[in-house]
C-alpha cells in the first residue's frame, strides 16, 4: 500500500449520503446483490480518447476498506445512526466482484469501464472511492497523453508538484502522468514510490545566488558534470545565457560530457531557434534544448508547427491539474438488481428528463472490434449473455439514436471488461506499482498504435464509434416505452 493513500483506506472515505442510504437499506432488509457500472459521457479537453488510470490504486484501497473503532465512534456521534447498524459496519468489508478495463486502455463515452457485483450496501459505500481514484487519474493520464502526442512523442518531464492540489493530488498525478506518457518527474517522493526517474535542473535562484551567471553555470557543471542543464533566461537568453552556457559546455565536452539548456520564458518559438543556431555554430549539434513555462498540448502543437527545435518539454501546472478541465466525468450507476420475489437478477434503467443522462440497462460487456490491419474500428456494448465473434457480421446501434446503425464484420475481437477481484480479493498476485505503471504505460502506447490518427487529433478529433448491440437496444426501448 502506498503511503499517500493509507488514510483513504478508512471506509469513512465515502459521501455521507451513502451511509444514510446504507442504514436505510439495512433497516429495510434490502442488502441484496446488485450490479453497478462506471462510465462517462464526454471526453475531457474536447478530445477523441481518454486513458483509463487509477483502477490499480482503487483495488489496493478496496482490499482494506473497513471501519475502525474510531470511525464507528465518529458515526455514533452524528446522532442519526442506530447501534445495530453501527455494529454491522464494524464487520464491513468489500466482498464483491470487480470487472474493469486494463489500466492504460483507451476508453470512450457510454461504455462501462468498471462493473461492480456486490451486495447493495457494499456497492453503495464504495462509490466515492472508485470515482475519486479513477476520475482524477484518468483525467491526468489523458491530459499527459495529449501533451505527449502533441510533442511528437518526445520526452515529457512532469514538473507539477508545486502546483498540484495537495500531497495526494501530486502523488496521484505523478503516477497517472507516467501512465499517460511522461518519462520523469520532479516529485522526489513520487519517484521513490513509483520507481519513476527523478528529473530536475536548476532554478533562477541558483543563478541569482552567485555573483555572475557564468560562475553559477561553472559551479553547477563542476558538481553535476553528467547532468548539466543550464537555465539560460535569468538575465538575457541571447546576450548572456546561451553564451555562458556554451563557454561552460565547451569545458564539459572536452571532458567527454554533454550538456543542455532550458528556456522558461519569452518567445519560445523564436528563442529556441536562435539558441539552436548558437549551439550548432559553436559545434554542439547534440546539445539539447528543454522548455517549460505554462505549457499545454495546444502550445506545444503550435511550437512544433513553427519548427521550434525543442528536444524535451517540462510540463507542470496544466498537466497535473487538468488545466482547463478540473475533473473527469465518470459516474456510477446501478444497472441490475435482485428481484425480491424471484431472487433473480433483473435489469434496471435510469431514464431521466434529460435523454443524454439515460443509462443502459442490464449487465453488460464491452468488445473492441479490429479490422484486418489490426486497427480499432469501434467498441460494442452488449448484454452479458451475448458473445461477439470475429468473422461474423453484426448490426450495431447508436447508444442514443436507435435508427442510426451500421454493420461490421471484425477480423478480431477483444473483450475489454476483465474480472479483477472476486470475493473482495484480487485475482492473481498484486504487481508492485513501479512495475504496474510500466505495464499500464506500455498498454497505453501499444493501444495508441491501434487507433487512427484522426481519433488522436488535438483539435476536432474524429468520433470513435461506441455502439450497442441489437439486444441491448431492444431492452432499452422496452423500458422507454413504459414512460
Language-model-detected regions and their locations in the chain:
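Hydrophobic residues within beta-strands of alpha/beta enzymes
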Residues: 199, 261, 289, 311-313
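Short coil/turn segments at secondary-structure boundaries
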Residues: 73-74, 142-146, 160, 456-463
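N-terminal, Lys/Arg-enriched amphipathic/low-complexity engagement segments
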Residues: 30, 34-90
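Buried, small/hydrophobic-residue-enriched core segments of structured protein domains
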Residues: 1-33, 42-44, 80-81, 86-284, ...
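Short amphipathic alpha-helical segments
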Residues: 55-57, 139, 436-440
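Gly/Ser/Thr/Ala-enriched C-terminal appendages of enzymes
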Residues: 2-32, 36, 41, 45-47, ...
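Alpha-helix initiation/capping motif
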Residues: 15, 54, 67-71, 75, ...
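Short hydrophobic "strand-cap" motifs at the C-terminus of beta-strands
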Residues: 292
